[in-house]
Amino acid sequence: MSTIEEQLKALREETLTSLKQITAGNEKEMQDLRVSVLGKKGSLTEILKGMKDVSAEMRPIIGKHVNEARDVLTAAFEETAKLLEEKKVAAQLASESIDVTLPGRPVATGHRHVLTQTSEEIEDIFIGMGYQVVDGFEVEQDYYNFERMNLPKDHPARDMQDTFYITEEILLRTHTSPVQARAMDAHDFSKGPLKMISPGRVFRRDTDDATHSHQFHQIEGLVVGKNISMADLQGTLQLIVQKMFGEERQIRLRPSYFPFTEPSVEVDVSCFKCGGEGCNVCKKTGWIEIMGAGMVHPRVLEMSGIDATVYSGFAFGLGQERVAMLRYGINDIRGFYQGDVRFSEQFK
């Protein structure tokens, strides 16, 4: 065996032994070894320099051994690199393994705002009574907001201090009644009565304090058909109050005045804290004012082209904030709008 063959054998055995000793995470050590063996200035290149001393007859044989050694070592380096990568991935997977039997981490979830809860609950009550829910414009025409509600241009209730005007004829609605006017215009009474509620945000030029806000939410109801009477209104109000505040609640109607209804009434509910005995909530009266109502004024019907001698109707309106404050004992309306999570989380 020539000296070159011995050197090749020794280099091969030494390199293979060194590769077996390289562990995962030591890829640089393997790369350095590869350069030192197979690189341009590596051990194999140094051995090849001895080819000049080999006879012409032996050069093909020695060259074959050199190529075999190069192929074996190259394959060994590639196999080692593959094994190191597999070990690296396996170690990484082991460190990141998930125990599927462990309980999951709870996801922080939100909840509906108390006003949304109140609105949806009230809407569900009316839907169950056969009413339709109708939305409308918050930016409204003066004509629909006032004139169609029997509030002519010179009516004192149209004081500028009560309304946000955008132009002389465009304003932010002060109630959701314009939705009812448009609904009466569009309804085909030959197919039956109109039964609807119109929930939504309204705007008044009030100074914000514990009981007043420049914006709040109303739900107004309207029923128009043949032979609709005050008795129908009273029965409807009684049912609404009982569903919202409890079966034991009673109502009391007091005469009042609204331009768009005649007769008009204020609706009181028996105090749900003291049961009518008198307390701070009801101001010692046993009753709590809850909403306004009345029979639709004939002029309001006629402005929609409805024959007031054939058709009649009733209307009512209540504030969602008012209902929520009474039900949950909230004494400051501003809490609904300040975005305080501590306040909102009480009503999950």
Swiss-Prot record:
Q: Does the keyword Hydrolase apply?
A: no
Q: Which InterPro entries match?
A: aa-tRNA-synth_II, aa-tRNA-synth_II/BPL/LPL, Phe-tRNA-synth_IIc_asu, Phe-tRNA_ligase_II_N, Phe_tRNA_ligase_alpha1_bac, Phenylalanyl-tRNA_Synthase, tRNA-bd_arm
What general EC class does the enzyme of this chain belong to? ligase
Q: Which domain of life is it from?
A: Bacteria
> What is the species of this protein?
Streptococcus pneumoniae serotype 2 (strain D39 / NCTC 7466)
Q: Kindly list the places in or outside the cell where this protein is found, as annotated in its UniProt entry.
A: Cytoplasm
Q: Which residues are involved in binding Mg(2+)?
A: E262
The GO cellular component terms are: cytoplasm
Q: Does the keyword Cell membrane apply?
A: no
The record's section on NCBIfam families has: pheS
Keywords on record: Aminoacyl-tRNA synthetase, ATP-binding, Cytoplasm, Ligase, Magnesium, Metal-binding, Nucleotide-binding, Protein biosynthesis
Task: Describe its partners and assembly state.
Answer: Tetramer of two alpha and two beta subunits.
Q: How is the cofactor bound?
A: Binds 2 magnesium ions per tetramer.
Record-given protein name: Phenylalanine--tRNA ligase alpha subunit
Q: Which SUPFAM superfamilies does this one have?
A: Class II aaRS and biotin synthetases, tRNA-binding arm
